[in-house]
């Protein structure tokens, strides 16, 4: 039998792969490209046979007639007109759209979202009626948040937005793996080292007590006040040294370094002294070993702030924190883009992000059975700010009650010039004495060298 006998006859002109053309030609026009000219539809010009199927270009429209085929280009689609929004209702900057119920810029949208999600508590240092515009919006967070509420921004919109995102992108219920990357491990070690070098642990101290004002509360014991003033001054110096060792801190502008140090000084002082709390004795120990009970802390100058500080110290979270966690939480308190008057808040936020991630992974690795410990630690920042706001009020009261020169802690909280010598100055191991309002404190310069290891903070 010849090879011709083994070859199947080609399908008829009215068939394509076994299907009758009239039934499918209009549903599968691309199949027509493989047909011969004699088997096509009448009046329609066809392309030569191609290997496989050919698809008409989407850029053309085929207009069929009984005599010819015309190729007409598609008219171009005009681009949509850009939407124009009213200026930001909060600061009058250029709006990026409607956010949380009102026309707002990206800056005010992000500020409002962070404030609500983190339950931030702000304080106005003026009359609670600051002008908020594009230029002044970062100067007073309290008034900026109030302006957000006044123009109609909604808390519920922030919460609903978070819930909506959770529903739209559900995460698998598989257990997350918290493995420290080399970069995160290195960051934790650097922060822990910075903390330990500037704040010795309670077990390293030789504790001693004093009989001054140990039994009865008085308005102020001058001897204890003098001692506390000396120790708080050393604490501030050590806080500056701690900040200088944090990765990226010295890359910020000098003005932002000053702002962050002044804003977080009292937060860190309170957090640190609370980690030296001994619950069974109800005492706190300073870095030179001085141990004071609740009554003595009151008489040393804490006054009505005393019970707030002891209540914070007696919570489970501060009692369970180790050096790495205390250091990371202190760094997060310090490097915070929500502080007022920052020149580069976005850069500060970017420096804070790896610290937050490091704390989260470290806490969950250390306590796999307590998944809520990390958010509880972050909530302590809000508590700290509440206590430190009361502390700032107490400092102002003490300034009026005690005549003469101010200790450094009062200068930092009261006088905007207290840290303005950051660009240069003496070494921080130089003797520090109380300074008068309006003078500078070269010992606090983050650009200066480290102080000697023998000087400890409270």
Swiss-Prot record:
Residues 154-182 are annotated as: Hinge. GO terms for biological process: cellular response to corticotropin-releasing hormone stimulus; central nervous system neuron axonogenesis; DNA-templated transcription; positive regulation of neurogenesis; regulation of transcription by RNA polymerase II; retinoic acid receptor signaling pathway. A zinc finger (NR C4-type) spans 88-108, 124-148. The keyword Transcription regulation applies. Keywords: DNA-binding, Metal-binding, Nucleus, Receptor, Transcription, Transcription regulation, Zinc, Zinc-finger. Pfam families: Hormone_recep (PF00104), zf-C4 (PF00105). Residues 439-458 have a biased composition (Low complexity). Residues 183-417 form the NR LBD domain. Residues 1-87 are annotated as: Modulating. One of its GO terms (cellular component) is transcription regulator complex. One of its GO terms (molecular function) is nuclear glucocorticoid receptor binding. PANTHER family: NUCLEAR HORMONE RECEPTOR, RETINOIC ACID RECEPTOR ALPHA. Composed of three domains: a modulating N-terminal domain, a DNA-binding domain and a C-terminal ligand-binding domain. The 9aaTAD motif is a transactivation domain present in a large number of yeast and animal transcription factors. Belongs to the nuclear hormone receptor family. NR1 subfamily. Heterodimer; with an rxr molecule. Binds DNA preferentially as a rar/rxr heterodimer. This is Retinoic acid receptor alpha. The lineage of its organism: Eukaryota, Metazoa, Chordata, Craniata, Vertebrata.
């Amino acid at each position: 039998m010849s090879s011709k006998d083994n070859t199947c006859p080609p399908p008829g002109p009215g068939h394509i792969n076994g299907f009758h053309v009239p039934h499918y030609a209009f549903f599968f026009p691309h199949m027509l490209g493989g047909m011969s000219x004699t088997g096509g539809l009448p009046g329609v010009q066809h392309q030569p046979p191609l290997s496989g199927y050919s698809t008409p270009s989407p850029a053309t429209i085929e207009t069929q007639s009984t005599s010819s085929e015309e190729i007409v280009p598609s008219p171009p689609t005009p681009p949509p007109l850009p939407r124009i929004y009213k200026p930001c209702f909060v600061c009058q900057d250029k709006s990026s759209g409607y956010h949380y119920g009102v026309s707002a810029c990206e800056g005010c949208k992000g500020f409002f979202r962070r404030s609500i999600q983190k339950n931030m508590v702000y304080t106005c240092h003026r009359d609670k009626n600051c002008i908020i515009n594009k230029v002044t919006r970062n100067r007073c967070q309290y008034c900026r948040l109030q302006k957000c509420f006044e123009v109609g921004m909604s808390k519920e919109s922030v919460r609903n937005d978070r819930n909506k995102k959770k529903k739209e992108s559900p995460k698998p219920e598989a257990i997350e793996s918290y493995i420290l990357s080399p970069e995160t491990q290195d960051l934790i070690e650097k922060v822990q080292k910075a903390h330990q070098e500037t704040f010795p642990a309670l077990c390293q101290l030789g504790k001693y007590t004093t009989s001054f004002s140990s039994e009865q509360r008085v308005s102020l014991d001058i001897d204890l006040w003098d001692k506390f003033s000396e120790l708080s001054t050393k604490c501030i110096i050590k806080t500056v040294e701690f900040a200088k060792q944090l990765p990226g801190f010295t890359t910020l502008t000098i003005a932002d370094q000053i702002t962050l140090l002044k804003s977080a000084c009292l937060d860190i002082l309170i957090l640190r002294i609370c980690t030296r709390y001994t619950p069974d004795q109800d005492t706190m120990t300073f870095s030179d070993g001085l141990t004071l009970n609740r009554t003595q802390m009151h008489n040393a100058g804490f006054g009505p702030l005393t019970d707030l500080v002891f209540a914070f110290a007696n919570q489970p979270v501060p009692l369970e924190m180790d050096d790495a966690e205390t250091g990371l939480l202190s760094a997060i308190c310090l490097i915070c883009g929500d502080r007022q008057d920052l020149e580069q808040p976005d850069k500060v936020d970017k420096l804070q992000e790896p610290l937050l991630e490091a704390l989260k992974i470290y806490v969950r690795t250390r306590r796999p059975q307590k998944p809520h410990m990390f958010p509880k630690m972050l909530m302590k920042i809000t508590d700290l700010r509440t206590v430190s706001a009361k502390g700032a009020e107490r400092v102002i009261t003490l300034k009026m009650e005690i005549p003469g020169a101010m200790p450094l802690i009062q200068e930092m909280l009261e006088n905007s010039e207290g840290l303005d010598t950051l660009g240069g100055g003496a070494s921080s191991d130089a003797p520090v004495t109380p300074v008068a309002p309006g003078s500078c404190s070269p010992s606090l310069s983050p650009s200066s060298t480290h102080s000697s290891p023998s000087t400890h903070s409270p």
